[in-house]
């Protein structure tokens, strides 16, 4: 669709009213995702033991640093910052995931067996420990499939698709890029899910105790250092900080492009400033 944003595609195939609904919904989604990915990495970075009692242990410091980067990523052409950094981030993800997968094969941990998965559908699933609802009472159906789906494709990913489409030089690259990315991310999700199951033999209560203690960052660090030692710990720290930021920068960039597409606003420097500054200013005040 020539790199059109999601509301534009909805308007093309449905009508202008549906386009308006999608525009509002998409803009809200992108904005709040961006805000979350200011607060999340800032919190993770400021809580690192290495930064204790220094300016780097100040949450506001990291919020401002991340906002400054988001401003540049939102304003500047995509080939100036984002495409320069993302290959390195992608390499980090590939190296971490491959290393974890190899470590799992070498260590060959004892994993719980699913057993008869179809037993879940004939009401005898409570006999299988792995299929019991977790202590919070959340059922495995449909939450398991929500989790798996988010590892391969999600509503947020669909808002990022136009950015990639506008970077492709030929339509023949569409299938290998989009389908390949979906398959790769699915594999990454499966490897980390397997690593998570193996790293917490005590099951969900053990995982929840660590989440309550230090959040997802501590869990990633525990898994990475457990399988890869000191090197894994270093990669985990970088990954936990960097990967949320790569979602936040494209969220705000997509928000600007979605508004520009909807109202046919020329992308002059002045117009980009008039859009980016208020959006990021509001985002900052929402982090306070």
Predicted regions and their residues:
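Extracellular/periplasmic helix-exit of transmembrane alpha-helices
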Residues: 1, 105-123, 180-222
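Hydrophobic transmembrane alpha-helices that form the core helical bundles
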Residues: 1-53, 241-263
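Flexible loop linkers connecting adjacent transmembrane helices
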Residues: 1-18, 177, 202-227, 255-259
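Hydrophobic, small-residue-rich membrane helices and short re-entrant helix-turn-helix hairpins
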Residues: 6-7, 76-90, 156-189, 206-220, ...
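Loop-to-transmembrane helix boundary motifs in multi-pass membrane proteins
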Residues: 19-20, 56-65, 180-191, 197-198, ...
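Hydrophobic alpha-helical segments and their helix-loop junctions in multi-pass secondary transporters
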Residues: 34-38, 42-52, 58-74, 93-130
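Helix-loop junctions at the membrane interface of multi-pass solute transporters
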Residues: 1, 71, 147-182, 193, ...
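Selective recognition of specific alpha-helical transmembrane segments in multi-pass small-molecule
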Residues: 26-34, 70, 90-107, 154, ...
């Amino acid at each position: 669709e020539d790199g059109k944003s999601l509301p534009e595609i909805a308007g093309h195939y449905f009508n202008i009213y549906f386009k308006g609904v999608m525009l509002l919904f998409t803009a809200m989604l992108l904005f709040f995702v961006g805000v979350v990915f200011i607060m999340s990495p800032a919190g993770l970075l400021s809580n690192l033991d290495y930064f204790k009692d220094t300016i780097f242990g100040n949450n506001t410091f990291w919020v401002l640093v991340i906002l400054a980067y988001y401003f540049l990523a939102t304003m500047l052409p995509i080939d100036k910052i984002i495409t320069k950094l993302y290959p390195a981030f992608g390499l980090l993800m590939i190296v971490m995931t491959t290393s974890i997968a190899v470590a799992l094969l070498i260590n060959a941990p004892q994993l719980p067996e699913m057993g008869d998965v179809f037993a879940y559908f004939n009401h005898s699933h409570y006999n299988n420990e792995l299929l019991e609802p977790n202590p919070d009472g959340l059922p495995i159906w449909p939450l398991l499939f929500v989790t798996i789906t988010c590892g391969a494709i999600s509503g947020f990913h669909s808002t990022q698709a136009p950015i990639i489409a506008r970077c492709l030089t030929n339509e023949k690259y569409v299938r290998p890029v989009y389908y390949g990315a979906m398959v790769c991310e699915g594999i990454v999700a499966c490897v980390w899910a397997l690593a998570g199951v193996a790293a917490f033999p005590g099951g969900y209560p053990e995982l929840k105790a660590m989440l309550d203690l230090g959040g997802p960052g501590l869990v990633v660090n525990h898994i990475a250092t457990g399988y890869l030692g000191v090197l894994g710990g270093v990669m985990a720290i970088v990954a936990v900080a960097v990967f949320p930021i790569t979602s936040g920068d494209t969220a705000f960039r997509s928000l600007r492009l979605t508004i520009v597409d909807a109202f046919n606003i020329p992308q002059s420097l002045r117009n980009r400033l008039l859009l980016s500054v208020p959006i990021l200013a509001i985002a900052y005040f929402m982090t306070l």
